[in-house]
Amino acid sequence: MPELPEVETVRRGLADLLPGQAVVRATVFDSPKSFPNSPADVQQFLYGAHVTAVRRRAKVLMIDLDTRYSLVIHLKMTGQLIFRGANSFAGGHPNDSLIGELPDRSTRVQIDFTDGSRLFFNDQRKFGWMKLMPTDEIENLPFMQKVGPEPLDKKTEAGDFIKRIRRRQNSMIKPAFLDQSVIAGVGNIYADEALWAAKIHPQTRVRNVSDDQLEDLFNELRQILQLSIDQGGSTDKNYVDAEGRKGNYLSFAHVFRREGQPCHRHPDQEIVKMKVSGRGTHICPVCQVEIK
């Protein structure tokens, strides 16, 4: 599943191309699961609408329209947004095989614009979705009300993070860190990387982690997320950015997918892969000692 840096990379690519585009047609290939709106909604609020902005909240994308409606998209595991223009290609999280004829068998929604360009929402496993809804009602969606603060927002401070994660005192730190109500957009890759950077074992209980360590974890997370965005995200399996390029962050990774390789702090110690709450987890046993 794409995490915050990957979704933000997709957003930036589409934000360069979609604003100003006018919708002329929408074709739904998989309804109602992937696109639950009625034809009447599409006719009234999507046809003829101009794109005004492309936004992100946590791992969710929002394409705002001048009808005061928005297309809200969650890519989930294998969702893809692919923009095809006369002389341009953009998208996010597609397989290389999808850079070809579109629509294909994984296409769930196709949106056509007046200049002949098209936006495809593809999803092989059908976990993702696209929904047309009033812009001012997005914040009332259940998952939007539960999601925590944005880690890269200047208004978000370490104290906010500490207060929220302390609500899970008896939880192991990694699953608490992955809780989207604690901090938005963090997934397995960046949880592993930030915990290594802060020298915290992922199985340590939150109650045994000091406030200073939690502040360090928050600050390390911010630096790692920004580095990943600068590098176009992480190419884990099939992710590419809005220009069709693979993300480069994993070449900077310290632990994720580096099992059996030497730790960058302790070259004599290999990175180990383990399971924490059912999630594959990468650690350095020397850097990250579990506190019980």
Predicted segments with their positions:
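Gly/Gly-Pro- and Ser/Thr-rich, intrinsically disordered tail segments characteristic of DNA damage-repair
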Residues: M1-M130, D268
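A generic structural signal for well-ordered coil/turn residues at beta-strand boundaries
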Residues: R57-K59, R105-T107, F143, E259, ...
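Basic, nucleic-acid-binding surfaces and adjacent catalytic neighborhoods in DNA/RNA-processing proteins
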Residues: A22-V42, R55, F89, D160-K292
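Phosphate/anion-contacting hairpin/loop surfaces
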Residues: L71-G185, Y190-A197
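Generic detection of long, well-ordered alpha-helical segments
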Residues: M1-L4, P151, K155, S210-F218
